[in-house]
Curated annotation (Swiss-Prot):
The organism's place on the tree of life at top rank: Bacteria
SUPFAM superfamilies in the record: Ribosomal protein S19
Function: Protein S19 forms a complex with S13 that binds strongly to the 16S ribosomal RNA.
Protein name: Small ribosomal subunit protein uS19
A single Gene Ontology CC term: cytoplasm
Origin species: Prochlorococcus marinus (strain MIT 9301)
Pfam families recorded: Ribosomal_S19
Keyword Mitochondrion annotated: no
Length: 92
């Protein structure tokens, strides 16, 4: 279930301030954030935001198709290394 329209999208205040400051300064440096639940807004297009996945910050370049999604969707937290193979010649 989505967020109520009358409330508007959630975005961390500190992240919003950093993006707006970079827009006024025409600066496109990487912004580090731990706020995976922040919604991607149109004013973020063209920025690179480093989203924390629990271990490191993963750089995410924001495009038009990402608007309305959350930052955490583009920084996976789990690594899949494949299923364990059976030993060769093992009998059940």
């Amino acid at each position: 279930m989505g967020r109520s329209l009358k409330k508007g999208p959630f975005i961390a205040d500190s992240l919003l301030k950093k993006v707006e400051k970079q827009n006024t300064d025409n600066d496109k440096s990487v912004i580090k954030t731990w706020s995976r639940s922040s919604t991607i807004l149109p004013l973020m297009i063209g920025h690179t935001i480093a989203v924390h996945n629990g271990k490191t910050h993963i750089p995410v370049f924001i495009t038009e198709q990402m608007i309305g999604h959350k930052l955490g969707e583009f920084a996976p937290t789990r690594t899949y290394r494949g299923h364990i193979r059976d030993k060769k010649g093992a009998k059940s």
